[in-house]
């Protein structure tokens, strides 16, 4: 947590106050992993954090405000995904490594933020523009640099010249990775082995970007 932290009434929180606020967020994050978002109450979060509802309300007006704060944390962490794509080579064995690194990084990011990402998807599906904007920012961390990579490959004559726009293709690839990341158990029930998901995603991402299978 960086920058100045203030309470709901505008006072600057001291070191202990910041620690309490962060503990409340951490406890909320854990609860979202085991309880439906709509069932989480202020009193439950406060109790888990070892404090009172009154203390919770010093830092957040309601549970939704705290959830949005957690969502912003996911947005900040998504910046690391951009680095897995921007400026990376998609040629030869380097291209294979780029695809594998992106898939590994994306799956790791999703596992870390799984609970809050599910809440973001729920809020976005219900039409809440705040969650729609947050989801767009998370996806954009990969879609934008991936679209630039596709355009670069096409400009060098290494990819398919015709076909969907780079943005549409990049968006489809990111949506595919997100869907696989969020549904591993159901895919396993359908016969997809966990160990095969990452290489399958890397293959499809590489094909989508370059139009070719990865180099062996």
Placement of each model-derived feature along the sequence:
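Hydrophobic alpha-helical connector segments
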Residues: 65, 69, 83-112, 166-173, ...
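Generic hydrophobic, amphipathic alpha-helix propensity
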Residues: 16-28, 45, 70-82, 146
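Hydrophobic/aromatic-rich alpha-helical bundle segments in the mid-to-C-terminal region
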Residues: 118-121, 132, 153-202, 212-216
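Short amphipathic alpha-helical elements of helix-turn-helix/winged-helix folds
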Residues: 27-31, 109, 145, 176
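Amphipathic alpha-helical packing segments from all-alpha helical-bundle domains
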Residues: 76-82, 108-112, 119-122, 129-155, ...
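Actinobacteria-biased recognition of intrinsically disordered, low-complexity terminal regions
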Residues: 1-8, 214-216
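Helix-turn-helix
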Residues: 23, 27, 31-65, 69
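Alpha-helical DNA-contacting segments of helix-turn-helix folds
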Residues: 32, 66-74, 120, 124
């Amino acid at each position: 947590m960086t920058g100045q932290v203030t309470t709901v009434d505008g006072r600057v929180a001291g070191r202990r106050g910041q620690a309490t606020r962060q503990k409340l967020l951490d406890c909320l994050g854990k609860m979202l992993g085991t309880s439906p978002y709509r069932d989480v109450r202020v009193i439950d979060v406060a109790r888990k954090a070892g404090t009172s509802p009154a203390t919770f309300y010093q830092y957040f007006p309601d549970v939704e405000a705290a959830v949005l704060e957690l969502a912003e944390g996911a947005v900040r962490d998504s910046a690391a995904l951009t680095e897995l794509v921007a400026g990376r080579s998609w040629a030869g064995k380097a291209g294979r490594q780029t695809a594998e690194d992106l898939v590994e990084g994306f799956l790791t990011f999703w596992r870390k933020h799984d609970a809050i990402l599910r809440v973001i998807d729920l809020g976005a599906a219900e039409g809440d523009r705040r969650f729609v904007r947050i989801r767009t920012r998370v996806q954009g961390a990969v879609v934008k640099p991936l679209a630039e990579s596709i355009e670069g490959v096409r400009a060098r004559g290494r990819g398919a010249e015709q076909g969907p726009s780079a943005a549409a293709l990049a968006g489809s690839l990111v949506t595919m990775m997100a869907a696989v990341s969020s549904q591993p158990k159901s895919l396993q029930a359908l016969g997809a082995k966990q160990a095969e998901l990452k290489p399958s995603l890397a293959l499809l991402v590489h094909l989508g970007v370059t139009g070719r299978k990865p180099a062996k």
